[in-house]
């Protein structure tokens, strides 16, 4: 059994340890780690192996004569084992458990020492839920906001048998989570909320990379023959596609799940970590989860994101004349009759003048947009006027 090691690390050693941790967790490549640390890839591989075997202690010079501050006691070992077996931490993988011990129990222990304790106690680290075989990684984009990967994943996030859909977006250049939003099922509203949160916090991205789900791409898109395309035939945008056009965002449908490798790896990490974080925070409902995720994203990004090659952001500021609520919604066209009445879902609705709006109601046979969103219900847009 190795002794518990509490080493005082220099800033340089600490920086190396943080970068190597990202490498070991699979969030950056050897090449990226080498560039960040200004070392050769061969040297980085040696450091990675050493840290995996010995933890942070490996980064201390072997001849420094730096001794551990104290050795393990039986009571300390029993405490570690007891905590790992507790309902709070039992589902945490070993690396996450090491971090949680420091964050919530004020216990620092090297990964290798922790591994030895738990291994001898017959405790195994939960296996990663790898959805796809690893593939060669595509080079990151150079700037934040150039390309956003977006997806949703159903999972038992609350530790029950019920699955909920976590919608999310990750920046390709930095690996930074831009937003997360959970709903009962994968849906348009969930994706609209993700985009809304991104734009409010960062701005409008240049492009969004998605799968070929019907939310993003019309099911008729694949039915167009070459002759149809040459003849100029097109298919209607989905509601999401229409909204992205209004915002000037290029929507790029991926050809395979492997093409969205960064967000697929994000889901693996979150499926391992987030249920444990929810349990510690007492999160049990969708509303509680969405409130918690706002703070969790910052914590996650501090640990796992990387610096972009180009520090200039590609996000664009939202123009003052664009109301996100009237863009990120279901928008359908209708025609009104003499009494400013239109039909929707086999029901008739009458447009009323706004109390604070002197605009004239749409005349007969006018084309209007009906806006539908869980946040505000139903609104009507006629030219530039919105009727509640």
Predicted segments with their positions:
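Acidic/histidine-rich, metal-coordinating catalytic segments
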Residues: 200-232, 257
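Basic, flexible linker segments flanking DNA-binding modules
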Residues: 55-150, 155, 224-235, 313-320
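C-terminal, beta-rich DNA-binding module of retroviral/retroelements integrases
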Residues: 297-388
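Mobile genetic element proteins and their domesticated derivatives, centered on retroelements
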Residues: 19, 33, 44-47, 55, ...
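Charged alpha-helix within mobile-element recombinases
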Residues: 233, 239-309, 314-326
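Short, basic alpha-helical/linker "hinge" immediately adjacent to a nucleic-acid-recognition surface
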Residues: 1-4, 21, 30-85
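Mobile-element integrase/transposase regions
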Residues: 107-108, 119-177, 184-206, 241-246, ...
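Residue-level signal for the short linker/turn that defines the boundary of a DNA-recognition helix
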Residues: 14, 27-28, 92, 109
